[in-house]
Amino acid sequence: MHPFDIRTILFAKHAQHVVLIHFPIALFIIGVFFDFLGQWKRQQLLAVAAYYNLCVAAIATLPVVVTGIVAWQWELEGQKLKGILLMHLVMGCVSSVLICLVWFIHMRTRREQEDLPGYRLPIEAAAVGIVALTGHLGGFLSGVNG
């Protein structure tokens, strides 16, 4: 197995998920950071940066969920989920829904030209925590965290 062999890159049993997952995590966390900073500094430009980061993060969750399910099917041949893998799958789905919810709140208020609601900030903070916990569980599955 050669690290630059295209077949190795494209057809490794779970490599795509491991590579793709970092994009929505990073985009979401920095989007929430920009939103909190924009709220604190009252700068519209930061709110715009937050919106676009959250938008791309929401879009990026789709291939991540698909590759996660494919990795489960290929790597474990569709075995019954249990333990950390089950928690990771459930938390991954919850994380994806929360990322999309946060983006939807921003998109709706942007489209209707309203001020962003204050209730979004605790939702965003909780979502960052859930995303981080999901990533932590994924690290255990990949062997990075233990």
Q: What do the predicted segments below correspond to?
A:
Residues 1-146:
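Polytopic transmembrane helical bundles with strong interfacial aromatic enrichment
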